Amino acid sequence: MKSIVIFGSGIAGLSAAHELVQLGYTVSVYEAIDQPGGFFRSSRLGKDNMPSEYSWHGMGPWYHNAFDVMQQIPFNEKGSIYDLALSRPVDFGIFPHTDKAQFYDEGLKSIPKMFRMNTWEFIKWFYVMLKTWTSNNRSKIDYDKLNAAQAWKPFLKDKAYKTWRSCFGPWIGSDWSKVSLHTTGAFFKKQLTTKAIHRHKADQNGPAWTQGTGAGWLLFAGPSSEYWFNPWVTYLKEKGVRFCFEKALTKLDFDGTTITSAYCGEEIIQGDIYILAINPFIAADILSETPALESQEELKLFKPLVQGGPHIQVSFRLAFSEELKFPRKRTALVISDSEFNLTLFAEEQVWDKEVDLGRNIKSLWTGTSCISSVPGRIYHKPVNNCSKEEFVEEVKAQILSCGALDELIKEANHGRGLKEFSLLKIEVWHEWKFSPEGIKSLQPKWVNSTNTQAYLPAQKTPVPNLYLAGAHTRTQAEVWSIEGAVESGRRAAKAIDDRVEVLDQYRPFWISSLSKIDDILYTIKAPQFIDSIVLFLIIFSLWFTYLIVSSL
């Protein structure tokens, strides 16, 4: 069988290796740093052994390929990652500073309360959402150039508008100042309409259960590297995959037809087939070293794909010396009025009891600052220009200002508010380098934003032995996510060997049908399908009114 060289041991690279080694290929994986997992990895670097992570991520009911892969990876001798390493669904709530926290307790009926909308605002909110769901080409071309927050702004009052946009970073993963209407619509379409039935076995937390359409998201029952990537790499090594860490790709040799070799510094790497599963910023730099390669179809998309620059979402941990309880199980938070658009989760709510939180730590909250361009309340600086100390003080102040959070803490802790608990420290993911000139990460992160859809490359390139993987490539997931990464790795593997199975995203018949109608309307430059229906009803009403008046 042919030899496969994969650059990158993030989720996409590991997914491609997983599929190809099982089909008999000789697979080698090269990784720039000393551990796998990419932007989802965890680590324990401090003397207190406290776990840290790049950012916390959930897994939704439409993560079909991700869950399928997890079912194939042994966690231990008792079962798979899917069976033993996943939590039950988290309970995500919107936590404003002055109002009560609101949760998704009643399905779609909960949305007006969660986002502080009145009935008329909710109707207009759904009108915009429905337009994204019933568009195909129009959404990919036109709506991708529209900022989602700005698209909804004319239809919502200020309070509802700011509350609604606050969920974009924590849920979609792309901050509200940059995420497109297309990406936002695609995300909620899958979440609320996917045909999902992911069955889970009974465990210490209760009987067997099902994660269905619209259900809450799952987390790992421990740090991501310890509960996914380490077992996965162990499994792949047993299957024959060779891993080479701290080997960064620096150059690809191209003879005008194929890739003849690759370089990690001075070391020459050779194989029959190469898969680039590295972040697109680094890929763009490597391709620029070889203009003849950079100009190839699909590969020439990288430069415009990364033109918007890296995404800044800074993760942090709050370590407490006492256990803080919540009145609801597995409570996840969006601090909706925080300037830095903070999201939080207390890890001990879902982590196995044997997981070490760190020396003297009884409660460990993981959080993410989801927008970097809005000035904070203390220093009046955005995350982009804060020092590390200023960032930590801002995060602390914004969390302590959240009245909804403090109310729930008091409810579950005998009247004690958040300020009354001893905070040992606030830790920030170690790769972030703060500077007045601008915050930077050792590994720049890409996410979907306005005007990126047109530049997503396919997994198969015109170079017959070069393939691409990563959530920045074209997938049915359509969102930079764990599912998008797994799907892309599988699609890259399938482009090499058609025996690889990729699970498709479900599209309801009514959405598929109406989207096809809108494609016709878009071709003839007619209004969007929903707009056309509304316009027709208005004209019909006027005509009917005219007939009635004329007959009098």
Where are the regions that the model predicts?
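C-terminal segments that line or cap access tunnels to active or ligand-binding sites in enzymes
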Residues: 203-220, 263, 272-273, 278-456, ...
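Conserved beta-strand-loop-beta-strand element in the redox core of flavoprotein oxidoreductases
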Residues: 251-269
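Active-site/ligand-binding neighborhood in enzyme catalytic cores
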Residues: 128-251, 255
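N-terminal Rossmann-like FAD-binding beta1-loop-alpha1 element of flavoenzymes
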Residues: 2-29
